[in-house]
Design a protein with these regions (language model features):
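Beta-strand/loop substructures that line and gate deep hydrophobic ligand-binding cavities in soluble
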Residues: 98-144
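Glycine-rich portal/gate segments that line the openings of hydrophobic small-molecule binding cavities
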Residues: 24-25, 32-99, 153, 165-168
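A conserved amphipathic terminal alpha-helix motif
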Residues: 127, 131-171, 176-182
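Short, surface-exposed coil-to-beta transition loops
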Residues: 13-15, 78, 102-107
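A short, structured loop/turn motif at beta-sheet edges
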Residues: 21-25, 85-89, 109-118
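Short coil/turn motifs at beta-sheet boundaries
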Residues: 9-11, 76, 101, 114
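Glycine-rich, low-complexity intrinsically disordered segments
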Residues: 72, 91, 104-107, 140, ...
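Hydrophobic ligand-binding cavity/cleft-lining segments
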Residues: 1-63, 173-191
Length: 191
């Protein structure tokens, strides 16, 4: 098993980031729900192709799983990934579990900057030989595109979640019988 921060020294990385007005705790809720039946939020066809390739060579790429309960812990398995770091609401690092010529980690970092929250997704890669370097070079453009799309979608989902919560609070604050009829001044009877 890799150590929690070992990947920070890996020589190759690709990342994307996005900003949202959603709170870090809400962004974490979205990020930490990744995998399993939830899939990967965007461009799932690309993830599925890579998973199928892994399955063809005997890997666990097509396995769908998430830990029971809502709290992630180091060692938990999410599909073929292993949780290295689960530091709510700031950081989630996942060890790449598919067959590949090297070792990889996907890390999400959530940080508050002023009145916005920044979420980044970064792939770290330590190649094993020339095959690992070539693998990275082939995958890097897709990673750059994918992580920009992924972080934007995470932000969109977090904003939608907060909007749904706000709407539920408004509904809960209304009287049980609902608001009465609203009449314009012209429709009211004047004495």
């Amino acid at each position: 098993m890799a150590t929690a921060d070992e990947h920070l020294g890996y020589p190759y990385r690709a990342s994307g980031e996005a900003r949202t007005r959603a709170r870090p705790e809400t962004v974490w809720r979205v990020v930490s729900s990744i995998g399993g039946e939830n899939r990967y939020f965007t461009l799932n066809a690309l993830w599925t192709v890579r998973e199928a390739m892994d399955a063809l060579i005997g890997g666990e790429g097509l396995v769908r799983r998430r830990p029971e309960g809502g709290t992630l812990r180091p060692g938990d398995r999410i599909d073929s990934w292993t949780v290295l770091v689960a530091d709510a609401p700031r950081r989630l690092a996942l060890l790449f579990g598919m067959k590949a010529p090297g070792r990889g980690v996907l890390e999400f970092v959530i940080a508050r900057e002023g009145d916005t929250t920044v979420v980044s997704a970064t792939a770290y890669w330590r190649p094993k030989g020339l095959a690992g370097v070539l693998y990275w070079r082939a995958m890097e453009p897709a990673h750059l595109f994918l992580f920009r799309m992924l972080t934007r979608e995470i932000c969109r989902r977090a904003e939608r979640l907060e909007a749904e919560w706000a709407a539920a609070r408004v509904r809960a604050a209304q009287p049980a019988s609902g608001p009465g009829p609203r009449l314009s001044l012209a429709a009211r009877r004047l004495p």
